[in-house]
Every structure is written in structure tokens, then in C-alpha cells.
Amino acid sequence: MSNTEKNLPTKYDHMSVEEGLYQWWLEGKYFEATGDEKKQPYTIVIPPPNVTGKLHLGHAWDTTLQDILTRTKRMQGYDVLWLPGMDHAGIATQAKVEGKLREEGISRYDLGREKFLEKAWEWKEEYASHIRQQWGKVGLGLDYSRERFTLDEGLSDAVNKVFVQLYEKGLIYRGEYIINWDPATRTALSDIEVIHKEVQGAFYHMNYPLTDGSGHIRLATTRPETMLGDTAVAVHPEDDRYKHLIGKTVTLPIVGREIPIIADEYVEKDFGTGVVKITPAHDPNDFEVGNRHDLPRILVMNEDGSMNEKAGKYNGMDRFECRKALVKDLQEAGVLVEIEPHMHSVGHSERSGAVVEPYLSTQWFVKMAPLAEKAVALQQKDEEKVTFVPERFENTYLRWMENIHDWCISRQLWWGHRIPAWYHKETGEVYVGTEAPADIENWNQDNDVLDTWFSSALWPFSTLGWPNEDAADFKRYYSTDALVTGYDIIFFWVSRMIFQGLEFTGERPFKDVLIHGLVRDEQGRKMSKSLGNGIDPMEVIEKYGADAMRFFLSTGSAPGQDLRFSMEKVESTWNFINKIWNASRFVLMNMDDMKYEEIDLTGEKSVADKWILTRLNETIESVTRNMDKYEFGEAGRSLYNFIWDDFCDWYIEMAKLPLYGEDEAAKKTTRSILAYVLDQTMRLLHPFMPFVTEKIWQHLPHEGESITVAAWPTVREDLQDTEAAAEMHLLVDIIRSVRNIRAEVNTPMSKKVQMQIKAKDEAVLAQLTKNSSYIERFCNPSELTIQTDLQAPEKAMTAIVTGAELFLPLADLINLDEERARLEKELEKFDKEVERVQKKLSNQGFVAKAPAAVIEGERAKEQDYLEKREAVRQRLADLEK
């Protein structure tokens, strides 16, 4: 990067800093994996975002963490591959494209499958471009030369091969099962596509008459329309109330069908009446009961949610219209005895908003138990297992894997991987293969596509060239090193990648899984359209820059925890960057055209020089160690404290003494240390704030083209000086204590005061005498006395630090009479406040009636006033000494 400016611009402007840098990085190919055999590979595949629109804050957080990892590893000398890509997102994208078509007054059926897919691909190209632009705005170091899409030809080949092999192993089968059905989009849904909402419904209590006329049996349901498909009534085998009825039959009201009373342990004796209706075609639990008792399955609804011919006179009605009509008929027949209001959780389609129907359907399934067993067994092998960070999520994962159900993988959509199965037009024979049958004219391909998660489960290896196991990238970069993702998709994605990786590559797809939480608003609420509390990361970047947003996102929570987003805290980070900018300007203005090779740390160093280099070593160690543990928050806080407190507030101020002095050797050493420390700090900070660190680094004396490929800092033992660090800590404690005393008595630093220091021994005396120039510079004493045998003067403010006592005579600091009068007035005020609040708290009526929070607030006030009153009393006592 050409750099003609000697100094940074006066003001930090994130927009001008970030403009053009990303394109410069791409042109330099700094993010492309090199395949250099001398370097150890490090691989992350990006969790592919859906090509459905804009990226949200969760994506920005997730990808920022990955960028921090890959930038750090690249600087540490690894051959880094961070592979980008996007997911076709079957139902989500199809819903968006269909919505766009509806605006034009046409449906997908008007277009036909091929034309509709052309529209979907047009959508994909448009939104993939938007996503790449957003990745660039965030500053993500992705290797675009290897970008993948789940419907790419190579990935589609992998999907077909996996389907066929699982089918041939008997692990994929076709059968009837209860699935989540969306009547609006007419497709099966995965569990993650079902949003559960609390809805006001009702329990409908009904009497089913015993067929022999000897009475009735009472039960309740929240979905009365499904009773039209009832094929049994069940009770618990140990329920004494109903034992005598087991084996008898009831007559289904309205329908008139005779159905058996069966015994099954699924029934809870203590819930409701202890009797449940069994509808095998419309409830997953009833389906299982039906299988155990060989009950018929009567489907009473069509795919669009209307009632079918099995529903009798309700045929053609919408399911909810049917509910109203049926309830009315049941009331008139005297069967419905009570409607009890009931709040309950009802599944809704994430895409259409329709109430999801448990629905009997012929679908394709993956037999999960054999695959899950291998994945669970892997976790017993310490060297081969997948490591979860935080560790507690391993138990979450294992519990789910040990209680897994077969996976419905077919979807009634057009956008996606079409199932590689064909049915013979005459014989009905099923053919499954990676290629179509030779006599294709005699076969019809299955119309369904695969669940999006099926292809996503292959993402870590299909993107690297599998099923060609000789592919260069697959051989070099698989298995991957880390996966960064949210805890909400451990079941739907992480687990499936693990068992598919084991089944088809024989090893774990990634070594570590770093789990983060969800982004919430400042009140801890999940961000949603309904609450209107969503925040566009591009707007945050526009206002405060990518660096500020990234630093907040990466340091705002611990692994596995949710993140409360705060625009105020992003602004605070912007202020931090502004401080870095101003400190960097100071350093650069004092470089005196220094070249990189002129940086010399061998000269004689002051205590401040030795201290800042020791603190830099400690910061390098802390940041590196915490990065290795995925503790980005801890790493970021180490950097923040070092930059803000040690470097900006202390060292730069202390560096002004030699810089503005006459000693040329001291000036040169100070310039070298300023340049070195700022260079090393920018490298440590670079993964968090790539833009501003590159900009500053380019202005510093440096070696190499870009900070993105500069070497990661390492601890230098030759620059470690713990004794000097201890000396500096004493100086800092003294200076802080003096500043605190001055603040306490409202005496400005510009006013000179006497200062006496009693050193505890000769060693401390020697230290303080040697470094007295710092005390004089930062404490502004009219006279400084340092001795080991000082007596405490009368009427002086004192402070005790490790190794010394400080005395500042009050007469120098304040007018004693005026201060005494002021403190007496303060004491009187606090006496009244204590009396008022104690009177309130002793009032039994107040304590009995006031909310707990109000009482707690008053008690806190009492404690605060008591402490302040005691401090004033102590100050008055000091005046009288």
C-alpha cells in the first residue's frame, strides 16, 4: 500500500479509514490459502448463510469470531483456509421467490418447475452478491477463490452419492410417518422451521358412548376436528377406573364408527380423565400407539388443510371451519359437555405463519440410530472426539443423539436437491442411483427435494472436493479445525455434520466446536420483527464502523452466552479507537522519519521503558493464551487495559520527558520503544479491528506489505524486567494517590503543594530518588522530600502505598477554616438524610405496604448516607489533628 502521508489525519473517521482497504486486501490475495507444504494448514468452513436476504447481527457476530481466529492463525504462520459459501435454503428461498411472483400475479404452477427454478437462480445470484458486499463491510478474510454454494454441481454430486450409499446400506427408507406439515406451502417442515407460540385455545370435553349402551367414557381434546379420524380410545393398563372397559368399544359420535378401548402405558393416569382419543394419522404419539396396537390410520385432511371425503359431511371445509361446525353439532347431540379455555403451545410455520398440522404422509427418512451410535462412541475417544467449547454443550449434544428419532428428509418443494429416486411407470419399481435409469422414458423421478439440512450436513467435506478423496483441498484441509456456530442449531446442523462426516470420511469433520449464544436487545429480549428491536449490522457499521462493531461483538460475552447488544457500548468502543488513533498520531509525529531497521531496543532504558516492555510481554502472553482458549472477551480486555491504561495514560505521558529533553540517546530509545510497542499492539489488535490497525501500521516503520500477513507477536525474554515493573507500580501508586487526594479536596493539579514521602527502607528510598523526576512531573510538588525517617506532619492528608507513606500538608491544599465550615455543613445535611430515611424505615405501615424494591432502595440510601457521613466525620477529625 502506498503511503505518502507522514502523519495520520487529525481526526479518526471510520468511513475514510475503512474505504478501499478490503478491496486492497483481496487484490493482494492475502486471504487465499497457499497450499504451502512448509506451513501447517488451518481450516474453517463458514456456516453458510441463506441466500434469502440481508445478514443480521447474529451472522456478523458469528463471522467476526471466525475472522478473529483465521487472522490470528494466518499471522502465526499457518496456511489458513477460511472457505466461504452460501446455502440454497430450500423452503426459505422458495417462499421468497413465490412471494415475488405473487406480486406479479402469477404462481409457481403457472411457470412450471423449470421456469420457476430459473427465477430462483436469478434470486440466488442477486442476493449472493448482497451477502458478499456485507461480508466485505464486516472485513471478513475469506478465500473467495474457493467459494461454494450448496447447489453447485460438485456439492450436488456429493449429495446424490450420500443418498444412494445410505439407501444401499438400508439407512434411507421410504415410509408413512407423522411429519410437520405446512398447509400453506404444502410441504413437510423440519423441527427448526416450526415456531411454537402460546395460543388461547380450549379443551373440548366429550362423552364417547359405550357401544353396549352401558354408559360413556369422558375425554378431552384441543383439536376436535381430528376426532373424525379416531380409531381407538386408550386408558392406562393399571388404571382401576377403566380396567373393566378394556376390550370393549365406543361409538364415535357424529361418525358412528365403532372403535376399541385399548390399554397403553403412553396414557397418563393422573392427567385429565385418564382417557385419550387415538388418531394415528394426525398425532405423532397416537401414530406410535397405533403401530403398537395395529390400528388403522384414517387421514381426514387434504394437503391444503381442508377436510377430505373421510370427514363425511365436513368434506371440503377448512380445518378451522370444520372445528366450529363440528363443535356445534357435538353440542346439539349432547356429546360436548364442556369447553374449558386453555393456553397452549401451537406450532406455526416459520415461513408462512400457518398453524402446522401433524400429518400422515409418505416421506423419505434417514434411519438415525446406527449413525448416532458411531457419533456417540466417538466422544469416548479423547484424541479423536469433537471438543465442545464450552464443554457443557457436549452433554446437550449427547443427550439429543442418545434420544434421536428418524429424520424426515423429503420436502415438497422445487428448489433444492431433487431426490435421486425414480418410479417405474408400469411396475412401480423404485430405482435409486446417482445417474438416471438408462430407459428414462419408462420412469418418473420423485418430485420431492431433500431437506436443506441434508446438504448442509456434508458442508465440511463436500466443499473441499469430496467425493473425490484425491482432491488436493480435501487431502490438505480436511478435517477442519474449528466450527463456530450458535447453540440453537447444535441438533439440526452440528450433530448431522458429525455423523455424516464419520460415516463418509471416517473422521470428525472438525476438531473444535465453539458455541456462542443469541444476540438480544439491551433488555435481554430476542430480536424479532414483531418487537421491532432488530438492528441491521450495516447501519451499525455506517454509524460507528466495522472495527467498533467487531470489537464489541467479540468481547461482549463469554463462549456459550447470549450477547446483549448495546449501541452505547459500540459508541464506547469507537471512543476507544479514537484514543488509539490519537495515541498513534502522537507516536508518528515523534518518529522523526525513523526507518524500520533503525528501531533499536538495546539502548539504556528508563524504568518506564522497561515497565512498558514488560507489560507488553504480559499482554502478548495473555492475549495469545486466551485466543487459544477461544476466550476472545478476555483477550480483548487485556488489550484494552494495556492500550488505554498502560500505553496511553502512562507510558506516552512519561515518554514526553525524554522526547522533549536534551538527551539524544534517550530520545532515540524512546522513539524506538514507542514504534515497537505500537507495532506489536496493532498486530495483537488486528484480528479484532482489521481496518484501523492496517491503516496505522502502514504509517508506522514496518517490514512487509500488510499487517494481515505480519508475524504474530511473541514474548521476548530479553525485554522482561520484573524489578523495573515493580518500581513502576510503586510510582504509579504514588501518583494516583496524590491525584486522588487532590480530587478529594478539590485542589487542581496546577496548584503546587508540599509533598513528603516516607520510604520503608533504603532500597525503596533509592528507587524513589532515582525516579523522582516522574514524581515531580506528575505530582507537581512545590517541594519534594523523600526520607526513611520522616515523622508524619500535623494536619496533613496521608496515603499508604506498598513500600511508602505519603503526606500532603493540608495548609498547602486548602483554607482550613473554609474547609471546616464546608464539612460541618455537609455533616448537618447527612445527619438530616439519615434521620429521614431511618424514620421512614421504622414506620411499620410503610414497611408493610411498600413494594420490596422500594424498601430495598431506601435501605441502600440509608447505607450510602451513613458511609458518606462517616467519611465527612473522618475528614473533620483529620483537620483537628
From Swiss-Prot:
Motif ('KMSKS' region): 526-530
Known EC number: 6.1.1.9
Disulfide pairings: none
Keyword tags: Aminoacyl-tRNA synthetase, ATP-binding, Coiled coil, Cytoplasm, Ligase, Nucleotide-binding, Protein biosynthesis
Extent of motif 'HIGH' region: 49-59
Residues annotated for ATP binding in this entry: K529
Cross-referenced PROSITE patterns: AA_TRNA_LIGASE_I
Any Gene Ontology CC annotation: cytosol
InterPro entries per record: aa-tRNA-synth_I_CS, aa-tRNA-synth_Ia, Anticodon_Ia_Val, M/V/L/I-tRNA-synth_anticd-bd, Rossmann-like_a/b/a_fold, tRNA-bd_arm, tRNAsynth_Ia_anticodon-bd, Val-tRNA_synth_C_sf
Reaction(s) the record says it catalyses: tRNA(Val) + L-valine + ATP = L-valyl-tRNA(Val) + AMP + diphosphate
Domain of life: Bacteria
Places the protein is found: Cytoplasm
GO biological process, one term: valyl-tRNA aminoacylation
Gene3D superfamilies: HUPs (3.40.50.620), Isoleucyl-tRNA Synthetase, Domain 1 (1.10.730.10), Valyl-tRNA synthetase, C-terminal domain (1.10.287.380), Valyl/Leucyl/Isoleucyl-tRNA synthetase, editing domain (3.90.740.10)
Gene Ontology molecular function: aminoacyl-tRNA deacylase activity; ATP binding; valine-tRNA ligase activity
Protein family per UniProt: Belongs to the class-I aminoacyl-tRNA synthetase family. ValS type 1 subfamily.
NCBIfam families with a match to the protein in the record: PRK05729.1 (NF004349), valS (TIGR00422)
Quaternary context: Monomer.
Protein name in the entry: Valine--tRNA ligase
